[in-house]
C-alpha cells in the first residue's frame, strides 16, 4: 500500500549489520526504497561511520538491547565492498586487513555515497525505555528493546508524506527485567519461552580444531 504512493523508508535495529544488508540487497533487487535508517544503541560504531566517517573499534557497553552490543559489525564489510567501493575487492581487502588495529575512514567522495540511501541514529537505554512506554501507553503495542531503538528514528522522521517501516526483531518475553522496571505486565509468553530463564546454562571450551568441534555438534544434535 505504501509503495503505491512512494518509495519506502526502513528503520532497522542492528548490531552486526545483517538485517540492514538484507534490506540493501532487497533494494538492489528492485524493492523501492528511499532511505535505510541504521539504528544502534550506545555501541555506535555504525552510527559513527554514517555520521562522521569514523569506523573504529571501541569498548562494548552493556545495554538493555544485548543483541546490538557489539564493537565491530561483522557484515558491514559486505556493504563497503558492494556499495561504497563498487566491488573493488583489492581496495576492500586493504581497508579491512588493517582493521581493527587501525580504524577505517573512506575518502570524502566515496563516503558521501551514503547520502543516497542511508542515515543512522544512536539511542541510549533511557530513551529506549521512554519509547517502549510511550508506544505501549498510546498504541497498546509492546516493543522489545531492539525494535524500540529503531522506532526512535521513525518517530522523529515520519510524517504523512514520509512513511517508515520499522523492523521488529525479538519477542518482548525475552526481556522481562526491562518491563518489570517500567511496571508493564507481560501478559503472554510464547510456549517456546516458558521456563527458558530457569534452564541451566552450559559452557563448553574447545581448541581451534575442526574435528573436535564438529564431533561435539554431531553428538549433541
Q: Where do the protein language model's features map onto the residues?
A:
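PLP-dependent amino-acid enzyme catalytic core
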Residues: 1-221
Amino acid at each position: 500500500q505504501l509503495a503505491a504512493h512512494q518509495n519506502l523508508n526502513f528503520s532497522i535495529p542492528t548490531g552486526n549489520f545483517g538485517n540492514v544488508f538484507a534490506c540493501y540487497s532487497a533494494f538492489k533487487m528492485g524493492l523501492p526504497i528511499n532511505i535505510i535508517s541504521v539504528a544502534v544503541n550506545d555501541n555506535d560504531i555504525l552510527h559513527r561511520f554514517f555520521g562522521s566517517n569514523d569506523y573504529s573499534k571501541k569498548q562494548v557497553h552493556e545495554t538493555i538491547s544485548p543483541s546490538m552490543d557489539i564493537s565491530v559489525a561483522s557484515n558491514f564489510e559486505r556493504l563497503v565492498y558492494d556499495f561504497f567501493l563498487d566491488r573493488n575487492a583489492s581496495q576492500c581487502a586493504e581497508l579491512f586487513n588493517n582493521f581493527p588495529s587501525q580504524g577505517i575512514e573512506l575518502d570524502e567522495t566515496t563516503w558521501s555515497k551514503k547520502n543516497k540511501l542511508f542515515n543512522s541514529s544512536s539511542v541510549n537505554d533511557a530513551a529506549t525505555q521512554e519509547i517502549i512506554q510511550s508506544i505501549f501507553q498510546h498504541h497498546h503495542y509492546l516493543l522489545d528493546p531492539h525494535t524500540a531503538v529503531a522506532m526512535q528514528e521513525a518517530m522523529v522522521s515520519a510524517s504523512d508524506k514520509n512513511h517508515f517501516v520499522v523492523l521488529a526483531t525479538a519477542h518482548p518475553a525475552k526481556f522481562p527485567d526491562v518491563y518489570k522496571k517500567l511496571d508493564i505486565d507481560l501478559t503472554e509468553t510464547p510456549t517456546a519461552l516458558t521456563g527458558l530463564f530457569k534452564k541451566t546454562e552450559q559452557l563448553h571450551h574447545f581448541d581451534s580444531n575442526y574435528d573436535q568441534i564438529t564431533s561435539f555438534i554431531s553428538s549433541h544434535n
